[in-house]
Amino acid sequence: MIIVTGGAGFIGSNIVKALNDKGITDILVVDNLKEGTKFVNLVDLNIADYMDKEDFLIQIMSGEELGDIEAVFHEGACSSTTEWDGKYMMDNNYQYSKELLHYCLEREIPFLYASSAATYGGRTSDFIESREYEKPLNVYGYSKFLFDEYVRQILPEANSQIVGFRYFNVYGPREGHKGSMASVAFHLNTQLNNGESPKLFEGSENFKRDFVYVGDVADVNLWFLESGKSGIFNLGTGRAESFQAVADATLAYHKKGSIEYIPFPDKLKGRYQAFTQADLTNLRNAGYDKPFKTVAEGVTEYMAWLNRDA
């Protein structure tokens, strides 16, 4: 059995899909479906069982055996960069992750987990997986950074696989439940389909991010499980492309609309990553050599998925 925490969420459900595509269906999804809309991410997928996150954590902390576990993909976390409840964030992202990590270490179960480019904070260059480059801007980034630091202490003595992925700006299918935290491509598509002018912040041609397609993210996760390699790795494309490029690809697909530029909100000033670009040196040195989709390629594929029933 393979466990996917956050399996009804954005990246987790795409990992479930990638496993299904390889014929793997013996999957336990762990999630919190209090926000009931997330179930739609699983309706076209095949899993063996579902467990609520709280029940799962109780079993993990009690040391209860959950059966023959091949691997754990730990994608479950609070991923809101605008959540400022530090206790909630540390309990949810740090303590929970530590409990699950030790459960896996004691049983030599491969543990693949979601870290984040938010660990780098407001850098404009050198997004490198090393302490001197890490300075998170928000409590979400700090919770991810602290767990990475914890993993670094354990890695030299670990007898089983531990691998963390610093996700950059992931976009693609199955993110609709994220609301305001969904990608720009998702929001632009919604605005166009509602007959509105798609909106970007003023200066969006200067805001550049490493936008990585979620299908590529799932592929990297599965490749590492097969390779057995450990470490903490950036997971982006290695390219910085502008929000304007995302909009251009969206408009090109729809063949209509023009962008309305809106003022940059004061509340985001100083807390907003204006530039991200993954350094892929370590990922490539680990042996992962597949190409990553460009914004034009990924957004086009995503638009086709979003509008498949249109």
UniProtKB/Swiss-Prot annotation:
Which cofactors does this protein require? Answer: NADP(+)
Active-site residues from the entry: Y140, K178
Tell me which residues bind NADP(+).
10-11, 31-32, 38, 53, 75-79, 92, 144, 170, 178
InterPro entries the UniProt entry points to: Epimerase_deHydtase, Heptose_epim, NAD(P)-bd_dom_sf
Q: Which domain of life is it from?
A: Bacteria
UniProt catalytic activity: ADP-D-glycero-beta-D-manno-heptose = ADP-L-glycero-beta-D-manno-heptose
Give UniProt keywords alphabetically.
Carbohydrate metabolism, Isomerase, NADP
Q: In the record's cofactor note, how is the cofactor described as bound?
A: Binds 1 NADP(+) per subunit.
Q: What is its EC number?
A: 5.1.3.20
The UniProt record gives the binding positions of substrate as N169, S180, H187, F201, E202, G203, S204, R209, Y272
Q: In which pathway does it act?
A: Nucleotide-sugar biosynthesis; ADP-L-glycero-beta-D-manno-heptose biosynthesis; ADP-L-glycero-beta-D-manno-heptose from D-glycero-beta-D-manno-heptose 7-phosphate: step 4/4
**Could you tell me one molecular function GO term of this UniProt entry?**
NADP binding
- What subunit structure does UniProt give? Homopentamer.
Q: Which family does it belong to?
A: Belongs to the NAD(P)-dependent epimerase/dehydratase family. HldD subfamily.
What HAMAP family does UniProt report for this protein, alphabetically? Heptose_epimerase
Q: What is known of its domains?
A: Contains a large N-terminal NADP-binding domain, and a smaller C-terminal substrate-binding domain.
Name recorded for this polypeptide: ADP-L-glycero-D-manno-heptose-6-epimerase
Native organism taxonomy: Bacteria, Pseudomonadati, Pseudomonadota, Gammaproteobacteria, Enterobacterales
Gene this protein is translated from: hldD
